């Protein structure tokens, strides 16, 4: 589909855009404290709803898997995480508000749907919280205290199947792992084990020289290794790989972009990485047969 310009209707900076599972709706997050839901199609776009309730800039939005219904999560500078639920078409209500954090919540990530309805949240208070929906409508909470003591900037779930596992074999318990990035310039990997979160990388992954702005764990369908991309204020994107459970993570610089790198995002197949940098460029990268990363295209704005 050709590129099309979408007027969001926001009164301030747009920080995040998320497409729903079916590619029919966009959710946008803005410094005007609101979220907009926009219907998109080949013929254009239309404003469907404005979600109000946050008392500060909204940093990120994330759609839940549709098997849980029409749900959207948002996080804000106001320290709150809101789960929005669509009842009648385009009528959204706050189904749940989490106010456990004492500072800005900078990042949210839904777990793979195989793990249930489960949301991880990273905050400037240094903590990561994980909320798991129960059958009775309540939520269980677990927490990683002081994951990055001077602030968590990003969280991303691992795929629920271990690398190289036979998809659908049903023999393996789903994997519960998280990657996080922080203001301490590090990337950390966490594993949920016997009811608690434990650090799963020793030492922390520390090749960046400034804040880590984003982390993204790659889908690994049929791929033999685990891969995490990290983007930093230092201008670098680093690709971290671990061949099997318990292995050390190996880091390789994808590129020094010469400007802060804000976001990294994997294709659904896990073999193409999109990078958004501070020079307003979006570039796509693919790993060649020899293990080197090559730019495949630039996305024109």
Question: Residue ranges of each PLM-predicted region?
Answer:
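WD40/WD-repeat beta-propeller blade N-cap
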Residues: 7-14, 51-58, 98-105, 145-152, ...
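Conserved strand-to-loop turn within each blade of WD40 beta-propeller repeats
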Residues: 29-32, 74-78, 121-125, 180-184, ...
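Solenoidal tandem-repeat scaffolds enriched in leucines and small polar residues
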Residues: 96-190
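WD40-repeat beta-propellers
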Residues: 35-40, 61, 81-86, 128-133, ...
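A short helix->beta-strand "capping" segment at the edge of beta-propeller domains
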Residues: 1-11, 44-46, 250-251
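Loop/turn segments within WD40 beta-propeller blades
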Residues: 17-23, 62-69, 109-116, 156-175, ...
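Terminal intrinsically disordered, low-complexity extensions flanking WD-repeat/beta-propeller proteins
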Residues: 163, 213, 223-226, 236-238, ...
